[in-house]
Curated annotation (Swiss-Prot):
Active site annotation, chain numbering: E111, E131
Coiled coil: none
EC number of this enzyme: 4.2.1.149
GO BP annotations listed: carnitine metabolic process; fatty acid beta-oxidation
Keywords per UniProt: Lyase
The protein, known as: Carnitinyl-CoA dehydratase
PANTHER family, per the entry: ENOYL-COA HYDRATASE, MITOCHONDRIAL, ENOYL-COA HYDRATASE-RELATED
Amino acid sequence: MSESLRLTRNGPILEITLDRPKANAIDARTSFAMGEAFLSFRDDPHLRVAIITGAGEKFFSAGWDLKAAAEGEAPDADFGPGGFAGLTELFDLNKPVIAAVNGYAFGGGFELALAADFIICADHASFALPEAKLGIVPDSGGVLRLPKILPPAIVNDMVMTGRRMTAEEALRWGVVNRVVSPHELLDSARELARQLVQSAPLAVAALKEITRTTRDMSVEEGYRYIRSGSLRHYPAVLHSEDALEGPLAFAEKRDPEWKGH
């Protein structure tokens, strides 16, 4: 594993800390290491939730390492499994990821956060996609994911001028789930992770799959799709032991014992 990453396992929760002074920027080597970490998380049946954060309190991540770019690393370089930062194109990851944004999330750092399922940020955090000012575009998901969240006028402002969005503005627009003080950030992310662990893992996988694949469909189209047999996890939920265990545990007034099948 790369020196730029710290991995910590707390039972079913994996914490990934990006640690590349001074700005937690991501070059191809670091991106490959992050991809390996997220693939390991995906494939480990004992891990249920991941938290991605940055070291320090100033930068979550400044995105692509411009020093590496100046030394010849191309914008379309191979950034490894899962795309840039290991998560932006990891479309078959059906476990939840929480981005604990501890500071500036710029460029690919913002795109990394957008690829997570939940974003909790410190109150001093800010978000920006300044790529146009560098002669490139935010093509690691920013220009694709942000329009699904924000109105066109706000998107255009951010991607074409590089305007920064504050934590409170991000909360108001629904870009982040919650804003907390810096010293509460990791505790808040861990508490959310513990809440997610209480949900059945197969049901969570099905929910990620359904929301991802039906996002641009009408309700009627979505109904047809989830009943078409095209999904992997939704039919499995309907015939799973967990689907029996949940109601039984509720009736018996005890915590359910999820098996994931």
